[in-house]
Curated annotation (Swiss-Prot):
It comes from Rhodopseudomonas palustris (strain BisB18). Belongs to the peptidase M20A family. DapE subfamily. One of its GO terms (biological process) is diaminopimelate biosynthetic process. Its EC number is 3.5.1.18. This is Succinyl-diaminopimelate desuccinylase. InterPro entries: Bact_exopeptidase_dim_dom (IPR036264), DapE_proteobac (IPR005941), Peptidase_M20 (IPR002933), Peptidase_M20_dimer (IPR011650), Peptidase_M20A (IPR050072). PANTHER family: ACETYLORNITHINE DEACETYLASE, N-ACETYL-L-CITRULLINE DEACETYLASE. The active site is at 77, 147 (proton acceptor). Keywords: Amino-acid biosynthesis, Cobalt, Diaminopimelate biosynthesis, Hydrolase, Lysine biosynthesis, Metal-binding, Zinc.
Length: 392
């Protein structure tokens, strides 16, 4: 356990020293379990399985039994460190140098979890060991070890497990690194959806000297790529930027220079706003492909399953409360933003309003991932401000 159980830096260092490269836990959830159990939380460790994937350990802890109920969510798994020799400091040592805490997960998101735990423990220590002196209210932690990989045995199943137990949540703070430049500049109130597919064009293989005996899919797939990018998917909304389709690879699997290939494939991803669902986008894209094919090109799309729909937490009392806590500590009025990639908030939104607010994300997933120690202290103060206002 940390030498100071309510100190965010000490908690973060203990977490960073657990090399929990997804799907490994490496003791990270145990660090949290010991801290929360000692503070009076009812702590549950739950393992979920899925054929073809690793078994994943998860943690759910709650103190209090009544509303209002605020949940802090997050993940303790991290991406691989890459070339560890390229790191200035050991990726799993949790070392501080020149006021910066180094380590894989310092930003994404062990640092954020450490701040939320420290803030909650400090809050409880000044409120008689309860969310509110009256005994009303609940605080919980919903922590998974399966976010950075396939995300099938983590938050999505932990929420289902909690709901089956009768757990209900009023609001959730997900401590992902939401800030762009400085702590306090951004609250994520939603995320775009994500849909991936492979455009496949069938041709007829043949010798390049006899093109009339073959059908070359390469110029055909190039024409379809141009056609799909020619017209915007939408113009955006009040809370989302326009949906965007990006091709990420074009492949024919043909090492020869004298053979017309039989097939061409192009992979793409769409980041979409709340004007679409995955199903409506599939219909739209397939219609555009067929229109561009005419009666000559033979094309189809192989869609990947998507569990990442667009969502937004409408600005209101809860976002105002969090923004006020941020401005009170940092002096910054945060932007309410829906940019970036997907997160586990896409699962949480089906159970309660959720916002994302954590550290600054500039070094996440990079060599020498790091965060200023001062930011850990500031984020802890902000979370404490959220709790003070929430249980006022």
């Amino acid at each position: 356990m940390p030498s100071n159980a309510t100190d965010a830096l000490a908690i973060a260092q203990d977490l960073l020293r657990c090399p929990s490269v997804t799907p490994a836990d490496a003791g990270a959830l145990g660090v949290l379990e010991r801290l929360l159990h000692a503070a009076g939380f009812a702590v549950h460790r739950v393992t979920f399985s899925e054929p073809g994937t690793a078994d994943i350990d998860n943690l759910y802890a709650r103190i209090g039994t009544t509303a209002p109920h605020i949940c802090f969510a997050g993940h303790t798994d991290v991406v691989p460190p890459g070339d560890e020799a390229a790191w200035s400091h050991d990726a799993f040592a949790g070392e501080v140098h020149d006021g910066l805490l180094y380590g894989r997960g310092a930003v994404d998101m062990k640092g954020g979890i450490a701040c939320s735990v420290a803030a909650v423990l400090q809050h409880l220590a000044t409120h008689g060991g309860q969310p509110h002196e009256s005994g009303q209210g609940s605080i919980s932690f919903l922590i998974t070890g399966d976010e950075e990989d396939v995300a099938v045995n983590g938050t999505v199943k932990l929420l289902q497990w909690a709901a089956a137990r009768g757990e209900t949540f009023d609001h959730c703070v997900l401590g992902e690194p939401s800030n762009v430049e400085a702590l306090g500049d951004t609250i994520k109130i939603g995320r775009r959806g994500s849909l991936s597919g492979t455009l496949i064009v069938d041709g007829v293989q043949g010798h390049v000297a006899y093109p009339h005996r073959a059908s070359n899919p390469v110029p055909d797939i190039a024409a379809l790529i141009v056609a799909l990018g020619a017209e915007p998917l939408d113009a955006g909304t009040d809370t989302f930027q326009p949906s965007n389709l990006e091709f990420t690879s074009v492949d024919v699997g043909n090492p020869a220079t004298n053979v017309i290939p039989a097939q061409a494939r192009a992979k793409f991803n769409i980041r979409f706003n709340d004007r679409h669902s995955a199903e409506s986008l599939q219909t739209l894209i397939e219609a555009r492909v067929q229109a561009a094919c005419g009666n000559r090109i033979r094309a189809r799309i192989d869609w990947q399953p998507s569990n990442a729909g667009a969502f937004v937490t409408k600005p209101g009392a809860f976002t105002d409360l969090v923004a006020a806590a941020i401005e009170d500590v940092t002096g910054r009025k945060p932007e309410l933003n829906t940019g970036g990639g997907t997160s586990d908030a896409r699962f949480i939104t089906h159970y309660c309003p959720v916002i994302e607010f954590g550290l600054v994300g500039q070094t996440m997933h990079k060599i020498d991932e790091r965060t200023p120690v001062a930011d850990l202290e500031t984020l802890t103060q902000i979370y404490r401000g959220v709790l003070q206002r929430y249980f006022a």
